[in-house]
């Protein structure tokens, strides 16, 4: 179960700790394989739920950690990571709003800060050697703390299954509430929850009702729609139904409103960073409503070239976030450029929630470029349709010349 003790020199390790089976086993494993080093457990509160944090410190200490630091990152996560990313229009492979991906850089940053605070010389995570998260965490560590050693137990130990981990803990009389019958791998934060594994590994299987935990089944959702108003300033949601709220509070309120209507469910097969495809079911109720509202205002205020540019930035940003490149010059540049464009993204949107759908049905903005006087199909006094003839001749000039040359 262990490796040969070639790992000398590490004295203090900060472990990204969740209290789950993997990280519970990592604590004693580190002590056995890294010269009985001191383990500092670190848990990032990114809105995964209070129930996930209850008893966490006691569990970490019982497993062999000397300290447990639980850091509240909820407000910072929404304000400095979710809101800026959404302002770029980032959406991975046309579907995924990057709920897990956005959480990784803030967790990694906070883990490094704890390491500096306690004087650690190593960082440790419980990501598997098959997934994206190992790359995301270690990419952030490289940018923020290249001097610290990184330990990835799943790439070192010989344990391969949940049964192996349970046996390992039992041999050491370390109690755990985990079982070998866990079906799904889940990851939750304030923005979303992801579900992988179980029957989802076969793309021919429809997700069972037991997969979903945050949103109502759209088929069972209310038969009457609900309307929610969002006010946006500089590309950020500032009010929900007229109530001024902090970013985190706004997201929580929208989660509570949209989830009963089954809003925000997706079932995708995505291209992982490490080369393989994986299937995941994601629930993002409040974020889906926010995204719809931002898109609606952008339709009013961005001209054609600005909208095209924003879509290009969004596509690039989605890959940067998904691939763990938050702390890079390009990501910083895209965020800064999007801030400038977002200065005009102001207004109010009413979103209709009904059986899994979130549709913007009303929108207005003081910066709107839409003019009913110009757009009307009826009689108007501001647009001379004869002017279109000259524009069309110039617009199609290259095509005309090409056709003449072909004769």
Swiss-Prot record:
Keyword annotations? Amino-acid biosynthesis, Arginine biosynthesis, ATP-binding, Cytoplasm, Ligase, Nucleotide-binding
Does the record carry ATP-binding as a key word? yes
Question: Of which family is this protein a member?
Answer: Belongs to the argininosuccinate synthase family. Type 1 subfamily.
Q: Where does ATP bind?
A: 16-24, 44, 126
- Which pathway is recorded for this entry? Amino-acid biosynthesis; L-arginine biosynthesis; L-arginine from L-ornithine and carbamoyl phosphate: step 2/3
State whether it acts alone or in a complex, and with which partners, per the record: Homotetramer.
Could you tell me what this protein is called? Argininosuccinate synthase
Q: Describe the reaction catalysed, as an equation.
A: L-citrulline + L-aspartate + ATP = 2-(N(omega)-L-arginino)succinate + AMP + diphosphate + H(+)
KW Transport (keyword) present: no
Q: Name one GO molecular function term.
A: ATP binding
Listed GO CC annotations? cytoplasm
Query: Could you say which residues bind L-citrulline here?
Result: 96, 101, 132, 136, 185, 194, 270, 282
Task: Output one GO BP term.
Answer: L-arginine biosynthetic process
Q: Where on the tree of life does the source sit, at the highest rank?
A: Bacteria
Binding-site residues for L-aspartate, renumbered to this chain: 128, 132-133
In short, the EC number is 6.3.4.5
Question: Which compartments does it reside in?
Answer: Cytoplasm
Q: What InterPro entries does the database record attribute to this sequence?
A: Arginosuc_syn_C, Arginosuc_syn_N, Arginosuc_synth, Arginosuc_synth_CS, Arginosuc_synth_type_1_subfam, AS_cat/multimer_dom_body, Rossmann-like_a/b/a_fold
SUPFAM superfamilies, alphabetically? Adenine nucleotide alpha hydrolases-like, Argininosuccinate synthetase, C-terminal domain
């Amino acid at each position: 179960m262990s490796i040969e003790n070639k790992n000398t020199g590490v004295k203090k390790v900060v472990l990204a700790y969740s209290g789950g089976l993997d990280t519970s086993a990592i604590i004693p494993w580190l002590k056995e394989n890294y010269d009985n080093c001191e383990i500092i457990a670190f848990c990032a509160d990114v809105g995964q739920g209070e129930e996930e944090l209850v008893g966490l410190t006691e569990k970490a200490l019982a497993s062999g950690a000397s300290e447990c630091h639980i850091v509240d990152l909820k407000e910072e996560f929404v304000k400095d990571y979710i809101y800026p990313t959404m302002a770029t229009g980032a959406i991975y492979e046309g579907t995924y709003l990057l709920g897990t991906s956005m959480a990784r850089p803030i967790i990694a940053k906070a883990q490094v800060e704890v390491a500096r605070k306690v004087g650690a010389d190593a960082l440790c995570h419980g990501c598997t050697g098959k997934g994206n998260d190992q790359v995301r965490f270690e990419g952030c560590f490289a940018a923020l703390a290249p001097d610290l050693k990184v330990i990835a137990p799943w790439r070192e130990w010989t344990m391969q299954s949940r049964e192996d981990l349970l046996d390992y803990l039992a041999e050491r009389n370390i109690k755990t509430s985990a079982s070998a019958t866990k079906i799904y791998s889940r990851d939750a934060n304030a923005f979303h929850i992801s579900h992988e594994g179980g029957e989802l590994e076969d793309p021919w299987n429809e997700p069972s009702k037991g997969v979903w935990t945050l949103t109502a089944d759209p088929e069972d959702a209310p038969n009457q729609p609900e309307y929610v108003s969002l006010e946006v300033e500089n590309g950020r949601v500032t009010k929900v139904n007229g109530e001024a709220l902090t970013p985190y509070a706004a997201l929580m309120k929208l989660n509570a409103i949209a989830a009963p209507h089954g809003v925000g469910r997706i079932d995708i097969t995505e291209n992982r960073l490490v080369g393989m495809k994986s299937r995941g079911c994601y629930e993002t109720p409040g974020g889906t409503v926010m995204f719809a509202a931002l898109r609606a205002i952008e339709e009013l205020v961005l001209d054609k070239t600005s909208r095209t540019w924003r879509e290009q930035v969004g596509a690039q940003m989605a890959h940067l976030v998904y691939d763990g490149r938050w702390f890079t010059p390009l990501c910083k540049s895209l965020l800064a450029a999007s801030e400038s464009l977002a200065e005009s993204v102001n207004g109010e949107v009413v979103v209709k929630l009904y059986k899994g759908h979130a549709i913007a049905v009303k929108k207005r903005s003081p910066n709107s470029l839409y003019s009913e006087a110009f757009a009307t199909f009826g009689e108007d006094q501001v647009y001379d349709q004869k002017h279109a003839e000259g524009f069309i001749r110039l617009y199609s000039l290259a095509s005309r010349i090409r056709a003449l040359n072909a004769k």
